[in-house]
């Protein structure tokens, strides 16, 4: 990711779900599992905090899926490995798997869009050239990218059917968590990567200071992992769009149009105006999944609209920020059964059918960012403490600006609409 920021000093730490370990690194992963689950991963800021929607922050016009998570897209799985060691290591790995099979042998179409490219998104050029994923997506810390990629490639090559493979395009994204994490130690190891990959599951997704979000900072408060989804009404296709992201960036926090960061006195460039405040720099990795049958060109258009959701939260994608979106489709019609194979075949969406998906991804991205902030709790780490977003003052500001419970203002949906 981009530059580190100075910050007012937030986080939630979670534990990945247990899963059987496989492959040559399994014994190492099992040992790491014991170490991670024995570590003090409980929130440091007290009771668990609500998601944004549970607190009355309703974003947009479309309804979320049952989980309001990227895993509402059928088959998508998420796993976390949170790495906390002593007082200085606050980092981890988050793995996003597009389906239950082998990602190399059953490839999904994909696209990458760059808002500001101050980052190290490994594997991006091949995805942009060929328009497909051939590995899971990993998120981690900046100086852990290469170790994470090496571990994922070793894990993938050990899977059945991979005996003759001689080239793998590992996709690994990052943000710089060096305020709370001793990033120069590069603490993410192979066993952490394997634990994230093999614990990946459907169902609810842990948010806040978990996995790759353990040490991140957003808008000067504790950031982390956030997720959200939208389901289109049947007459608009009924497709699902899910977003998962790693928030670690700056700006002037805006929630449903309310100037939260300004009113709380925590915003970018305040140091220039008043000789204090948070930096504009930082990064965000946004992963978008959909079950809509769209190929790489349309996925690129979809990914670009995720950046509009980012902008709504108060980001201006500064010079030192790495702002990336990776989008993929899980639809069987557009998958490809390995090198040399053609897509399975079937109808894909026309351009005219994409606008509802654009609206959905903007809404899900915006809400996922809010979730990353709402779920985070105050975290102590390598170079200080980062405070969580203060919820009651934030909700008071939102109430004052009429930014809560927007769902009550939407006219009733017509019969048959979700």
What are these model-predicted stretches?
Residues 29-37:
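Hydrophobic helical h-region of N-terminal Sec-dependent signal peptides
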Residues 44-418:
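Alpha/propeptide regions of enzymes that mature by internal proteolysis
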Residues 1-24, 36:
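Compositionally biased, low-complexity flexible segments
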